[in-house]
């Protein structure tokens, strides 16, 4: 099976405005620039309220225009032809953001592909709307897209990433992470000369020394004190400079969530640390494999007036007096 992974932008919405009937309806709904709406624009709700009628209208538009209706369809069908892929062997894995305009475009494109005899699936990922939630969006991309690429490869499918549509920061990250996950080919359709270009898609991996440090970190606990990291030979300050770990409190470091997801490509399920570590100021640390025992010990030290830090498999707590 040839799996094409493709993000969904809003070119369909923009192009549909060239149709007089569509444009009049969109203007009537007060959605003139509906392809450029921000995630928090109140008009997203208007799209949601009229979702079914808009979906039917756009599907009719696509049927009349075919692949020219959107960047997704144009690049996909051009690549099917260039690579001589048979419809019966194609599976298109689409992903849109969780905004109403992107979801609308995604559903219509998926439905059209199915009408054309091409198996297709659509998933929704979180919108990246600011620097603050960038990494949250990347984590969601791992959960819903990158791990699916891994699964497709485990099932001996060929995986092709369409880098043409969608938002560029996510497309760049998807391309890199997709290659790490074993994607076979990256392609892009240049509108300037109306042709699909197969991009260099070398097998890539994390530098061995960084991978060793990160795996050692993950197996030892997703949060480590600086002292413990030094004992393990992990240069946490270098990893912090590379934005792979983040500082928690004065002397603790934690793997960033997206790095934990990235390590899922390399670590088997269950390889992460499951211990509970309690660090008491002035007394060192103790490790427990039972949450109740760790909690009881922590409480006893806290009642003694000690500052306590508790590290559990996926987070860290600081408890004062």
UniProtKB/Swiss-Prot annotation:
It comes from the Archaea. Its EC number is 4.6.1.-. The keyword Membrane does not apply. GO terms for cellular component: cytoplasm. It is an enzyme of class 4 (lyase). It is found in: Cytoplasm. InterPro entries: SSO1393, SSO1393-like, SSO1393-like_WHD. GO terms for biological process: defense response to virus. Does not require a metal cofactor. Keywords: Antiviral defense, Cytoplasm, Lyase. It catalyses: cyclic tetraadenylate = 2 5'-hydroxy-diadenylate 2',3'-cylic phosphate. The record marks 168 as: Transition state stabilizer. One of its GO terms (molecular function) is lyase activity. CRISPR (clustered regularly interspaced short palindromic repeat) is an adaptive immune system that provides protection against mobile genetic elements (viruses, transposable elements and conjugative plasmids). CRISPR clusters contain spacers, sequences complementary to antecedent mobile elements, and target invading nucleic acids. CRISPR clusters are transcribed and processed into CRISPR RNA (crRNA). A nuclease that degrades cyclic oligoadenylates (cOA), second messengers that induce an antiviral state important for defense against invading nucleic acids. Homodimer. Belongs to the cOA ring nuclease family. This is CRISPR system ring nuclease SSO1393. It comes from Saccharolobus solfataricus (strain ATCC 35092 / DSM 1617 / JCM 11322 / P2).
